[in-house]
Swiss-Prot record:
One of its GO terms (biological process) is symbiont-mediated suppression of host innate immune response. Keywords: Host-virus interaction, Inhibition of host innate immune response by virus, Suppressor of RNA silencing, Viral immunoevasion. It comes from Rice dwarf virus (isolate Akita). Belongs to the phytoreovirus non-structural protein 10 family. It holds the Pfam family Phytoreo_Pns. This is Suppressor of RNA-mediated gene silencing. Suppressor of RNA-mediated gene silencing, also known as post-transcriptional gene silencing (PTGS), a mechanism of plant viral defense that limits the accumulation of viral RNAs.
Amino acid sequence: MEVDTATFVRLHHELLCAHEGPSIISKFDAIKKVKLGTLANQSGGVNNITEAFLAKLRNFERKSEAYLASDLAERELTRDTHKAIVFVTKSVLLGGKSLKDLLPYGVIVCAFIFIPETASVLDNVPVMIGNQKRPLTVALIKYIAKSLNCDLVGDSYDTFYYCNSSAYGKNLISVSDNDFSNPQRALLSVGDLCYQAARSLHVAAANYIRIFDRMPPGFQPSKHLFRIIGVLDMETLKTMVTSNIAREPGMFCHDNVKDVLHRIGVYSPNHHFSAVILWKGWASTYAYMFNQEQLNMLSGTSGLAGDFGKYKLTYGSTFDEGVIHVQYQFVTPEVVRKRNIYPDLSALKGGGS
């Protein structure tokens, strides 16, 4: 599926800068101005500037947006020890990885900037920067840094992108100031687009709705699969809310702020789903990036209404049994038109009616 790369990058840039612009500037500023040498050399004391920006980074650390080694003042610093900024999608952390797992070698102070899940669709579009192959996602990172007047490379720090694709030999990709030519058009896989939709919904479920913080009584991660249905538009959500509440009174709770329908009570593996969530990324990203014909394909049986609309992802939980296995199934307007809203989820394979 062909997409205009400038539109794709600009859209995600606007989304990220509108919501996280000041935070991004603050992280770059803090990483730039924290002088690690003054921490190791306690005889001269820590200067006030380093103290202030170190406090900022510790505040980001409390929000799981930065990492600082616990013994900074005792470190014997070498030229191989430095600071970093790492761009990454939040879904990387949901499977159980920690921020420490994402650190570049030798880095003891790092700030993390989270990009939208759908932006990583560009991971599979390679571009050449010098003699190195890099994912086109770096174009978004460079655009963000340039528009916010942030230096990607400083005298004591570097910037990286944690890429999910294995096509570049390693996950941590360095992002330099070197210019390169963006392709005007890029071919994106329908499968990749659908997968990123599921990952985006997964992040919303975990970090915004926080649906995994309190699992229903009777749910056992080692035995059960937690099922979530994703819908693309408010009208479909309203239909499912009204229909399910009328069909099974007292069995559901609708949160109209977070746009989610919860099944309440004891968990049963026989339930077709435990929650229905509006995936807002469809309206905020895909609807702007693609024409109507492409949107019809994405929401049809060759896309989200078929095999490409069902994914199993994991959430690193505090359960003794380990991670929670979550199945995401999209119910699209096409499925609703076929009046097949309440099937066993396996019946949706291939858009079955």
